[in-house]
Regions:
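Extreme N-terminal starter segment of soluble prokaryotic enzymes
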Residues: 6-11
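A mid-sequence interfacial segment
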Residues: 102-115, 318, 322-328, 332
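Long, charged alpha-helical interface segments
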Residues: 156-157, 161-173, 177-185, 295-315, ...
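Conserved mixed alpha/beta catalytic, RNA-binding, or beta-rich assembly cores of soluble enzyme
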Residues: 14-32, 39-58, 62-107, 112-267, ...
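C-terminal non-catalytic interaction/assembly regions of soluble proteins
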Residues: 240, 252, 257-313, 319-324, ...
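Amphipathic, soluble alpha/beta structural segments
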Residues: 328-345
Length: 345
């Protein structure tokens, strides 16, 4: 199960006041580069939930909690696959994380939406209320696939009980992104690191007593579009802002990507050298043929280069089959940045 940020959101409301709130909320969410698409639905709640439940990463329900619970009860399957569900009253007093707080990202989205609406966030998951990080939150923050998510509960219980958990990594690979994250975020958790040569370099194993959680490191690809002559510093300014929005370290990046028309662009080549990560220049034919509902095409780019998207499409193509955008195309003074995460299995 790949854990990554919420990208596609549906907002459902039942009253006129709730609908007006959904329009306001969509306005806020559309300005957020980490939210790829937001759609609005009104009334016919039960049928709408049936149709949407597994089509979106998150569903925000502006309605009484009783209506919400009765509507979603028959649809809930598992914390591994259920979408994030948020509940907001029509006066926007409270934003409640209702389902899939960690794995689905409801807690994180609740904080974001509450901030947008100047509302009170309501989060009830035990690790959060005790100011501790769950292992599923660590995986989510670092864009790791959890291979055996049923084990998560044992690790989060251990963390709540102040018991030690061990992160085991391959001794031949660089995991600075993990070490930096643990140093900065796990002051309340008893954590140690073990090195071995016996596990795959793209895996992190987390150990507690006789339990083992396997996390796979997915590729994070930066798609770049830019005007001719933009320097590596110009591109880096945009990239730094995107990484700050996503709370990702440069050390977590796997590849850069752009269209082959940019293969001699000094700024991109220099940035690749500086970050010490490869760059993939995608053939223009592939960019032209590539279709994804995530892509936000530009008529200007299409008129100039014959393709509707460079940064988003090159990131998704380079990240591979079933990859997802985690940062939609955003312009930074002649530079466009998009990020995609792979799904290797």
């Amino acid at each position: 199960y790949i854990i990554c940020d919420i990208m596609k959101i549906a907002i459902i409301s039942v009253s006129k006041k709730g609908y007006e709130l959904s329009l306001l909320l969509k306005e806020h969410l559309d300005k957020d580069s980490t939210i790829i698409n937001t759609d609005i639905y009104y009334k016919d709640v039960k049928n709408t939930f049936k149709l949407l439940f597994y089509e979106y990463d998150a569903i925000i329900a502006i309605m009484a909690s009783g209506i919400l619970i009765r509507s979603i009860a028959p649809l809930i399957k598992s914390k591994v696959c259920d979408p994030a569900i948020l509940n907001i009253d029509e006066n926007a007093n409270f934003v409640i994380s209702t389902l899939s707080g960690h794995l689905g990202g409801a807690n994180k989205l609740t904080s974001k939406v509450a901030n947008m609406l100047n509302a009170t966030e309501v989060i009830t998951t035990a690790t959060d209320v005790n100011k501790k990080l769950g292992v599923d939150v660590i995986a989510k923050d670092l864009y790791l696939t959890v291979k055996n998510p049923k084990e998560i509960v044992y690790f989060n219980k251990a963390i709540l009980n102040n018991e030690e958990i061990i992160f085991r990594v391959n001794s031949k690979e660089n995991y600075d992104f993990l070490f930096d994250y643990l140093n900065e975020n796990t002051l309340e958790i008893d954590v140690s690191i073990e090195f071995t040569s016996s596990i795959n370099t793209d895996e992190i194993h987390v150990l507690y007593k006789n339990h083992k959680l396997i996390m796979k490191i997915e590729d994070i690809v930066v798609g770049i579009g830019c005007r001719r002559g933009k320097s590596k510093e110009d591109i880096l300014t945009g990239l730094d802002k995107a990484l700050d929005d996503l709370n990702i370290s440069k050390k977590r990046l796997s590849k850069l990507a752009s269209g082959e028309i940019k293969k001699e662009e000094t700024g991109i080549l220099d940035l690749s050298k500086m970050l010490n990560i490869p760059v993939n220049f995608v053939e223009m034919d592939k960019l032209t043929l590539f279709k994804s509902e995530d892509i936000h095409e530009s008529e200007f780019v299409k008129s100039k280069f014959g393709v509707g998207s460079v940064s988003e499409a090159s990131a998704l193509i380079t990240a591979g089959f079933d990859s997802k955008l985690i940062y939609k195309k955003t312009a930074f003074d002649g530079v466009t940045i998009a990020l995609a995460v792979s799904k290797k299995d």
